[in-house]
């Protein structure tokens, strides 16, 4: 069907949406005293403060000295110390934020007239204890969706989806269950979720993660609906669950409280429609609205590199209408929206508030959890994104460790291993971070100074060199150009395809503070005789194994005229369309190398494995 084919829409020349102009948002703050009020935008030195207020420097230094804080003329006063000084010397004070290209994303404000607002669908996150049925509930809800059935039930995982209840009203679900994702978004200031559905197994009751989920939802002041799951089991005891939740002020309406409880089963789909109706009831009470007729803004919930599209992001629109051709800034990335599709794979021309869509057109991979804003000027958008990148680098170059850890480092009680990870997906990144938290080596710690989705770049190598960090790549190949830069800068890049092995290597390094030495042991070589291309797997090389053997999953190098062009892994190995584990010399086989786009007839695929070189004792 044509609706599933990518289309590049023309921008509507009669676009009447309210524009977002960066220049109109900019604000300068003039530090000084006006009408008895000292206005400032941030920390000042003692000398600067005295100059702006005409207070003698001796008086300021004496004031803080008597309070146990010795200062000099060049000492920097924090915003709290400035407030203290103002109160002591008879000034009112006011802290104002100066808005520039550097901080406009986090400080931009939209003053929409209430008459411009219209109801929007609620955005819901499922939370609860592991094994209580969060994922099963999401699947059950998805299967009730009439919109998906219109397209043959074909859906793709973009991180969020929409469903309709029996009356045709829409709800948006974030398809990343768990409070870790919820809290991670909030840590970046992203209040995406409107309603939390707390899943509790009726046969198991409250667990630690249930309590954590409640704390996170209450901290965000997000309404909670309780879904008591697994009611199809004979051991289910909903009254027990209700009593346990009472101490968290989650009391059902029939018990005199104001929390909605729904009893059901994700397995049998009992209670699903009641849950959807309850969500819409809360949404009606909370009155979620947005301005539809404005340049769009919202948040990214998933980012990745998608074959054929490049850097993509799944975003949820919170304000305005996003359209093809819009100029978007998303964290360090910017670009014009090139394609837009929903969870059913349908290519769209626009997305309205609460709508989740996957969009492409970015210059680099964005950052999940960051805010996106549509601007009317391409130059401003590019400058804002570049400023974000500069700030990231500054943060990365400042190792942020808690004070206790700093003291231990200074006293040489502890050593810190700086790490940089570049991976294939957000899921891999989360798994790596969890693996790092589980490493426990007395006297040692790991510090992830940078991590991201996408191939290793020259910037990653320069950061590794400047910080003395170890640089790791997971499930991604490595171009020869980047490898040459790393070699030139004296930076070692480790490519891994298994998280447990990566974690084991880092743990061994921590234990001995010695990097293991590996050597490449050749297994075999295959010559590329012909090429095919498949939309799902990329380039397929028809080869003849010339020496040794080729193994599926093995590391490999692509050689052209004896020069290494690419390093990766044998993702697929087939003999006459049948998957095989290995092929010996003299045999023909089809080979797919992960991430390799530049492959030619007569190239040589060198297959090898790494073996640790034992140190001489």
Swiss-Prot record:
Biased composition (Basic residues): 1-11
Binding site for GTP: 128-135, 175-179, 229-232
Region annotation G1: where it falls in the sequence: 128-135
Locations listed in the record: Cytoplasm
Family matches, as Pfam families: EF-G_D2, GTP_EFTU, GTP_EFTU_D2, IF-2
GO MF annotation list: GTP binding; GTPase activity; translation initiation factor activity
Region of interest: G5: 265-267
G3: annotated span: 175-178
Keywords: Cytoplasm, GTP-binding, Initiation factor, Nucleotide-binding, Protein biosynthesis
Residue ranges of every copy of the tr-type G domain listed in the record: 119-288
A cellular component term, taken from the record's GO annotations: cytosol
G2: region residues: 153-157
Record carries keyword Transmembrane: no
Keyword Repeat listed: no
Disordered, as annotated region: 1-25
Region of interest (G4), ranges: 229-232
Domain of life where this protein originates: Bacteria
NCBIfam families, per the entry: IF-2, small_GTP
PANTHER family: TR-TYPE G DOMAIN-CONTAINING PROTEIN, TRANSLATION INITIATION FACTOR IF-2-RELATED
Name of protein: Translation initiation factor IF-2
Lineage, top ranks: Bacteria, Bacillati, Mycoplasmatota, Mycoplasmoidales, Mycoplasmoidaceae
Gene: infB
